Amino acid sequence: MSQSIQFSTPSHTPHLLHLPHSQFNRPLSSISFRRFPLTTIKYTSIRASSSSSPSPDLDSSSSSSSSQVLLSPNGTGAVKSDERSVVATAVTTDTSGIEVDTVTEAELKENGFRSTRRTKLICTIGPATCGFEQLEALAVGGMNVARLNMCHGTRDWHRGVIRSVRRLNEEKGFAVAIMMDTEGSEIHMGDLGGEASAKAEDGEVWTFTVRAFDSSRPERTISVSYDGFAEDVRVGDELLVDGGMVRFEVIEKIGPDVKCLCTDPGLLLPRANLTFWRDGSLVRERNAMLPTISSKDWLDIDFGIAEGVDFIAVSFVKSAEVINHLKSYLAARSRGGEIGVIAKIESIDSLTNLEEIILASDGAMVARGDLGAQIPLEQVPAAQQRIVQVCRALNKPVIVASQLLESMIEYPTPTRAEVADVSEAVRQRSDALMLSGESAMGQFPDKALTVLRTVSLRIERWWREEKRHESVPLQAIGSSFSDKISEEICNSAAKMANNLGVDAVFVYTTSGHMASLVSRCRPDCPIFAFTTTTSVRRRLNLQWGLIPFRLSFSDDMESNLNKTFSLLKSRGMIKSGDLVIAVSDMLQSIQVMNVP
C-alpha cells in the first residue's frame, strides 16, 4: 500500500522565508536558514492549493459533491473512486513506449540501481573524436554532453558533428546533449598557419604580432587577435599561453611585433588564450573594455540557434547583464526548445560578480585554465569550491573543467595527482566533469573518458558506503508560493529517500525544474526524471544523478505510475518489490510505494 503526501496551505502554516537578493553576497556559512515544517498524514491525500483559507476537512462530513479519495489496491497511489475504471482501461490499452539512454538501461539491467553513475561527463569534440564511430564510442563510454569549441573549426565542420550526434541519438538510443562554447573577446592567438599545434622549446625566441599575412608567415611567428597588444605590453612582462601551459618573457618590441623568449616550454594550440603579467599582477589595460560577446560570437550563436544546440557556454562573463541580454536574444529567436546559457567563470570579474552571474544563468563552468591565468594558482582550488557551493545553493548545474587529465593527451595513463583532482571534484558533488584537449586532440580519448567514469563511480560508491549523508542546509530559492512548495517537497523526498533506503526517486516533470530540485539535494539513490519532450530530456542529462526518460504522461498519477512500472518492468530496469518515492510537479505530491 502506498503512502501519499500532498500539500495544502492552511492559514496557520508559516510561509517559507525567501532569501533576499542582498544576501547572495554574504558567505554561505554566515547565512541562517529556516525549514518549512512538514506534517506527514498517513494514508491520506490532500490537494495542494495556493489559497490561504484552511484546508477542507478530511473526514466523512466532506461535501458529497466531492469525489471520494481512495488508496489504490496495488500500492501505487491515490485515485478517485469514479476514475478507477478509466485508469485501468488507460493502463491496459496504452502501448506507447519510453525512451532512455542505451548505456543506462544496460547498467540498470545488469547491476541494479546503485550501479548508475551520478556525476555527468562532457567531452570536447575535435579532430580525434569527430567521426560517427568515434562519437559512438564516447557515448558508449558514458559521454552525456558533447561540447563544441567555436574557437576551433569552421561552422560547416561543427554542423557535421552536430548532425552526427543527433543521428547517434536517433539511431542508437542515446540522449547526448550538445553544448556550444563561444570564443569570447579576450586576447587569443591565431590559427598557427594551418598547423594543428606547435612546440615551443625552452630558450627559443618567438614573435607575437598583430600583422596579417597574405602568404605563409615566418617561422616561430604567431598572430594575435587584439590590435592593441603591442602597445599594451612592455619589455619584461610575462606572457602566459593557455592559462600558463607555455610561458614567455617579452624581450623586445618592434612596431607591431613583440619578441618573446620561451621560459616554460610546452604545446601551442590554435586560438589559445593569452594573458600578460607585470610585477606579479595581471595586466588588463584596454582589453578589459572588450565586449564579452564579440561580433563573431553573435554569428556563432545564430548558428547554434539554427542547429538547435542544447546549451551555449559564454566565455569570460563579466556580469549578469550579459547573460540576461543573451537569454532575451535566445528567447526571441530560438525555435521550439529552450537553449540553456552556461556562464564560464574564468576571470576576476566573474569571481567578483559570481552570485549575480550564476543567478542569471542556467549553469556555470569552472574554467580553471583561464581562471588560473588571472588569479594566483594557489587560489584556484578555493575558487573552485566556492563556485561549486554557490551553484548548488542556487540550484544551477556546475561543470568542473580544464586540465583534469591533461597528461592523457600524450600518455595512456593519468598521473596520480590528476586522479586525486578528479576525485576531489566528485567529492564536492559537482554536476559534471569535462574533458578538453584530452578528447578533442588527445591520443587516448576513450581511455581518458574511462578514467573519469571509473573514478566517479568509485568515489560515489565510497560516499554511499561511508553513509555520508549531507547535512548542509540549502537556502530557500523559490520566488512564487508554488515554487516554495515544490522545493520543500523535493527536500523532503530526498531526505526520505536516504532515511528509508529507497531504490529510486521518480520525478514527473514537464519543464525539468522539479527534477533539478531533487538533484540539488544529492540523494543516495538515482533519480528517474520523466519528461514529455526530447529537448528537456537532453538538458536534464547535464545534472547530477538524473536519469532522463521521455514518456508521455497525464496529471493522473495513478495512471502514470502504473504505465511507468509496466514499461520499466518489461525492459528489466525495475522489478516487483523495489521501493520507490514518486514526486510530481503537476500535483505537488510525494508518494512512497513498492513496485507491484
Curated annotation (Swiss-Prot):
Binding residues for ATP, per the UniProt record? 149-152
Q: Does the keyword Thylakoid apply?
A: no
EC numbers, comma separated: 2.7.1.40
This protein's transit peptide sits at 1-87
| Region of interest (Disordered), residue spans | 47-83
Annotated tissue distribution: Mostly expressed in seeds, and, to a lower extent, in roots, leaves (veins and trichomes), stems, inflorescences, siliques, pollen (grains and tubes) and flowers (sepals and petals).
Positions of the site: Transition state stabilizer?
Answer: 344
Q: Where in the cell is it found?
A: Plastid, Chloroplast stroma
> Which BP terms does GO give this entry?
lipid metabolic process; seed maturation
An annotated Gene Ontology molecular function:
ATP binding
| Binding positions (substrate) | 147, 344, 369-370, 402
Q: Which reaction does it catalyse?
A: pyruvate + ATP = phosphoenolpyruvate + ADP + H(+)
Instruction: State the phenotype upon gene disruption.
Output: Reduced plastidial pyruvate kinase activity and altered seed oil content leading to wrinkled seeds, retarded embryo elongation and reduced seed germination.
- List of residues binding K(+): 149, 181-182
What PROSITE patterns does the database record attribute to this sequence? Answer: PYRUVATE_KINASE
| Binding of Mg(2+), residues | 346, 370
Task: Write out the pathway annotation from the protein's UniProt entry.
Answer: Carbohydrate degradation; glycolysis; pyruvate from D-glyceraldehyde 3-phosphate: step 5/5
Bilayer-crossing regions: none
Give a Gene Ontology cellular component term annotated to this protein: chloroplast
Keywords assigned? ATP-binding, Chloroplast, Glycolysis, Kinase, Magnesium, Metal-binding, Nucleotide-binding, Plastid, Potassium, Pyruvate, Transferase, Transit peptide
Which InterPro entries does UniProt cross-reference here?
Pyr_Knase, Pyrv/PenolPyrv_kinase-like_dom, Pyrv_kinase-like_dom_sf, Pyrv_Knase-like_insert_dom_sf, Pyrv_Knase_AS, Pyrv_Knase_brl, Pyrv_Knase_C, Pyrv_Knase_C_sf
Which family is annotated? Belongs to the pyruvate kinase family.
Q: How does it assemble?
A: Oligomer of alpha and beta subunits.
Q: What is the annotated role of this protein in its UniProt record?
A: Required for plastidial pyruvate kinase activity. Involved in seed oil accumulation, embryo development and seed storage compounds mobilization upon germination.
Name of the protein this chain belongs to? Plastidial pyruvate kinase 1, chloroplastic
Q: Which organism is it from?
A: Arabidopsis thaliana
Ranked from the top, the taxonomy reads:
Eukaryota, Viridiplantae, Streptophyta, Embryophyta, Tracheophyta
